[in-house]
């Protein structure tokens, strides 16, 4: 479960994963445990609160994280099954853009930044799943 969570946090640039924001799903009537919640407390995702900057591989792979480790690259060290996330099932960037366009408060520049970051993260996840050492990409 935590490996999946780490990979999803990487794709969505969630930088606030710690033990108090991992949750479970329970049956509403019996309160019986169903499973761990696949995505929970992801409010600090998708570059929220981040400055819009030119995107480089180094920037994409240098995102800070709070909680278990200080950055995403360090968290990825805990992932043994690199193929847990089926990239083909992730939302397409057009869908991400469509959702952001519904918010009149979000600038076109911010939407472009978020979408480009998301595309690069999906690409990096694909490389990671294929065995690439992302630290080598970040620090050539």
Which stretches of residues belong to each language-model region?
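Anionic ligand-binding catalytic core segments
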Residues: 1-14, 19, 23-140
């Amino acid at each position: 479960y935590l490996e999946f969570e780490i990979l999803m946090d990487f794709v969505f640039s969630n930088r606030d994963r710690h033990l108090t924001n991992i949750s479970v799903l329970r049956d509403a009537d019996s309160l019986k445990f169903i499973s761990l919640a696949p995505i929970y407390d992801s409010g600090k995702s998708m570059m929220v609160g981040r400055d819009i900057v030119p995107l480089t591989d180094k920037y994409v792979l240098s995102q800070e994280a709070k909680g278990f480790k200080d950055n995403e690259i360090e968290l990825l060290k805990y992932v043994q099954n690199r193929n847990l996330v089926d990239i083909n099932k992730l939302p397409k960037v057009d869908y991400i853009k469509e959702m952001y366009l519904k918010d009149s408060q979000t600038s076109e520049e911010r939407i472009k930044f978020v979408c480009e970051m998301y595309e690069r993260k999906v690409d990096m996840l694909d490389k990671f799943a294929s065995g690439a050492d992302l630290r080598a990409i970040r620090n050539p």
